[in-house]
Curated annotation (Swiss-Prot):
It is found in: Cytoplasm. This is 2-isopropylmalate synthase. NCBIfam families: leuA_bact, PRK00915.1-1, PRK00915.1-3. It comes from Escherichia coli O6:H1 (strain CFT073 / ATCC 700928 / UPEC). It is an enzyme of class 2 (transferase). Homodimer. Keywords: Amino-acid biosynthesis, Branched-chain amino acid biosynthesis, Cytoplasm, Leucine biosynthesis, Manganese, Metal-binding, Transferase. Mn(2+) binds at D14, H202, H204, N238.
Length: 523
């Protein structure tokens, strides 16, 4: 009988470290709910002691996610563990994940300590975490470069202290699969109490071996795999969860393990993470790339037509990528749009039907037929722009030509007031941005601009993603329209609203802090 491999997602903690702009609490919650639908067993959603914003996002997710265990990261530091527990206490059940470096290099140069002191600290902090929860994970940072005898000592001590999961990270992506499997096997041979804990692995992709190392570890006895959707993460990224999950499913014959993942949600979750994090998926990415199930060779095409299994070891449908359907038009009613969203697996809580239908009608009037990918794009944009808006694009027009200076006129609703400005620029998009900057006086600096076609052919929607710098912080904005300049303008307005909301959140946090301080003085 096969054993279950626990899937531990760290998209919102380790994965977020790779992003050019931090995610909002709402965006993190949206990803967390998608991960919950996909069936991840554990989700690590932040490092609460690092900032009030991270604390709030962990607390918000812990309050709303019910079917996956929510986890927060903490160093082997008392305050880290206490703050993590405070952020998680609203959850029905939670995990605290604490870590300390164990390799000779890290102990000597980073911690300026000794192995004995590290073990003593690990024992104390695991016990402290156990005061808050019976689910404690302990990580040996840089385990891949830790001598097996030293690693075994740390692991045995952490388990004796109460750790229920022991994580073995290849922190710098250094080990080879056969080496990593040897580390796991070595621990099973050397640690007498190893049956009292789940052995987990956390691999990085610096040498392109993260997935291979994780699978080798599973084959050697690891029963939890940590990673991020689409493999996002600092440097070369984390282990791609979707790749590990599908490898376990497809090669169950030799691995003899399974996961509790709802495979039909993989595609949609991957796309959502890509869009919210503003990290496009390469076409040749395994499992979720746009070319993952494409066949251009004549020999391959012929073979697939005769029997898909000739060249496909899994089907698009197995990850929730269904065939494109069409024929929604401006004559289609709300019920038809809702029915199609239901068929694509969307719950009513994931989109606002009134807003979606209004956007659908406008798009249908422009392009005639509306496809599944159009609906998904409209639903995504609508979800991103549900929050209160201070700025709204009221009107814009541009004039440009091959030998002319581009000029733009823009009207922007700023709260209750509508303001208008005109500006020249290096092309129509730049002219629009210059006009918007004049209206708001925010002096936003564009750092990154990308355009993605949502759909096929000349009627495809254009999605613009931008990253902008304001007062030393980076903000992400997204816009969608059939017109590229309009998409660009909407993306900048989205950035402005994100800046405004961030300022409002900061004011609220300061108000709460002052309130707490006043209460202390009263006591």
């Amino acid at each position: 009988m096969s054993q279950q491999v626990i899937i531990f997602d760290t998209t919102l903690r380790d994965g977020e470290q790779a992003l050019q702009a931090s995610l909002s609490v709402k965006e993190k919650l949206q990803i967390a709910l998608a991960l919950e639908r996909m069936g991840v067993d554990v989700m690590e959603v932040g490092f609460p002691v690092s900032s009030p914003g991270d604390f709030e996002s962990v607390q918000t997710i812990a309050r709303q996610v019910k079917n996956s265990r929510v986890c927060a990261l903490a160093r082997c530091v008392e305050k880290d563990i206490d703050v993590a527990a405070e952020s998680l206490k609203v959850a029905e059940a939670f995990r605290i994940h604490t870590f300390i470096a164990t390799s000779p290099m890290h102990i000597a140069t980073k911690l300026r300590s000794t192995l004995d002191e590290v073990i003593e600290r690990a024992i104390y902090m695991v016990k402290r975490a156990r005061n808050y929860t019976d689910d404690v994970e302990f990580s040996c940072e840089d385990a891949g470069r830790t001598p097996i005898a030293d690693l075994a000592r740390v692991v045995e001590a952490a388990i004796n202290a109460g750790a229920t999961t022991i994580n073995i990270p290849d922190t710098v992506g250094y080990t080879m699969p056969f080496e990593f499997a040897g580390i796991i096997s070595g621990l099973y041979e050397r640690v007498p109490n190893i049956d009292k804990a789940i052995i987990s692995v956390h691999t990085h992709d610096d040498l392109g071996l993260a997935v291979g190392n994780s699978l080798a570890a599973v084959h050697a006895g690891a029963r939890q795999v940590e990673g991020a959707m689409n493999g996002i993460g600092e440097r070369a990224g984390n282990c791609s969860l979707e790749e590990v999950i599908m490898a376990i499913k497809v090669r169950k014959d030799i691995l003899n393990v399974h996961t509790a993942i709802n495979h039909q949600e993989i595609w949609r979750t991957s796309q959502l993470v890509s869009q919210i994090c503003n990290m496009p998926i390469p076409a040749n990415k395994a499992i979720v790339g746009s070319g993952a199930f494409a066949h251009s060779s004549g020999i391959h095409q012929d073979g697939v037509l005769k029997n898909r299994e000739n060249y496909e070891i899994m089907t698009p449908e197995s990850i929730g990528l269904n065939q494109i359907q069409l024929n929604l038009t401006s004559r289609s009613g709300r019920a038809a749009v809702k029915h199609r969203m239901d068929e694509m697996g969307y719950k009513e809580s994931e989109y606002n039907l009134d807003n979606l239908y209004d956007a659908f009608l406008k798009l249908a009037d422009k392009k005639g037929q509306v496809f599944d990918y159009d609906l998904e794009a409209l639903a995504f944009i609508g979800k991103q722009q549900e929050e209160p808006e201070h700025f709204r694009l009221d009107y814009f027009s541009v004039q440009s030509g091959s030998n002319d200076i581009a000029t733009a006129a823009v009207k922007l609703a700023c709260g209750e007031e509508v303001k208008a400005e005109a500006a020249n620029g290096n092309g129509p998009v730049d002219a629009v941005y210059q006009a918007i900057n004049r209206i708001t006086d925010y002096n936003v600096e564009l750092v990154k601009y990308s355009l993605t076609a949502k759909g096929h052919g000349k009627d495809a929607l254009g999605q613009v993603d931008i990253v902008a710098n304001y007062n030393g912080r980076r903000f992400h904005g997204v816009g969608l329209a059939t017109d590229i300049v309009e998409s660009s303008a909407k993306a900048m307005v989205h950035v402005l609203n994100n800046i405004w909301r961030a300022a409002e959140v900061e004011k609220e946090l300061q108000r709460k802090a002052q309130h707490n301080e006043n209460n202390k003085e009263t006591v």
